């Protein structure tokens, strides 16, 4: 992304990668809020220039944040409806990261990128989120794309789609 001119703020959620602690929905939401505050309050990045980008499990905290802040747009790559819907436990009452409920409340322009051969988070999740989304939205389907190869599979079309979306996202008033 940086090579294409996009500024990137990447971090590890608590309990993942180089971060200590235990992973949880609450911790992931706190972490993404901290990153937002750091960018806006300490670095002086205008909120309307920030694109929230969540990939796979990152779609949960990204949807959480997008409900609360005046960002430029939200991009979700290989997102899920909810965590338990991915692992076949959607009937439990304490499901986590219910993106399917959140996207209906998000006013930001939304781009969903999903591959038709994703065996981790089925393509149907991306379709369902697209249908449930309230604001301006676009679904970019990567034919034959899996969970971890969308950029590779789509090639230059991936970047063209992202560039076109970010060039003219419409805010819902």
What kind of feature is each model-predicted range?
Residues 127-131, 135-173:
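C-terminal catalytic histidine-bearing segment of alpha/beta-hydrolase fold enzymes
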Residues 51-54, 77, 113:
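Short beta-strand immediately N-terminal to the catalytic nucleophile in serine-hydrolase-like folds
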Residues 71, 75-85, 95:
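Active-site nucleophile loop of the alpha/beta-hydrolase fold
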Residues 44-56:
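Alpha/beta-hydrolase fold nucleophile elbow
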Residues 1-38:
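Membrane-embedded segments
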Residues 105-107, 112-114, 118:
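Short beta-strand/loop motif that positions the catalytic acidic residue
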